[in-house]
Amino acid sequence: MKGVSTQRGLAGLVSAVLLLGASSGCGYGLVGRGGGFDPSIKRIGVPLFRDGTGKVNLDMKITQKVIEELLKRGKVDVVQSIEGVDAIVEGEILTFQETPVGFSGGSTGSTTASRYAITLTVRVRYYKPGEVQPMWQNDAFSYRDEYDLGSDANSFFDRADQGVDRLALAFARSLVAAMLEAF
């Protein structure tokens, strides 16, 4: 009977440890489940990102997608002004690179680029006006995407624009997730 008593004691001990761990909030949490926005933030300003690349309309596309993503993520107003806001997201587009990564042979024996990678690097700062320390900052936030050019050379600009649009959306999602992960 001593074996049964030992098993009951061990089972009781294991149950007590599990119950204690569950009720004490062991400190584990799911990645990507940050608390979202600081409750004191009701209005966020996102001025037009500065563009050091010269890529036409890139600043407008990136800024617009960041605003849309912030609106999707919380119960805050988002405006393009820095007046009368509780927090500001400022960005500077540092680099925009299109690099051929896939090639195909033409009918004349020539090789042409058929797939491109786009890499975007942006300096971003998320802060409350008047505070010295930002709530979140990244001096080289990068995102990379690829797009196929297709076989029709006439569609190059359409495909390139679609690639930039897709990159802007994915970049904004990734950026806002990283910013809110800190909370």
Give residue ranges: language-model regions.
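A structural "domain/chain start" motif
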Residues: 2, 24-75, 79-83, 98, ...
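Bacterial N-terminal signal peptides that target proteins for export
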Residues: 2-13
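Bacterial N-terminal signal peptides
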Residues: 12-23
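Surface-exposed short loop/turn segments
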Residues: 73-77, 83-136, 144-157, 162
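C-terminal partner/receptor-binding element of secreted or periplasmic proteins
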Residues: 161-176
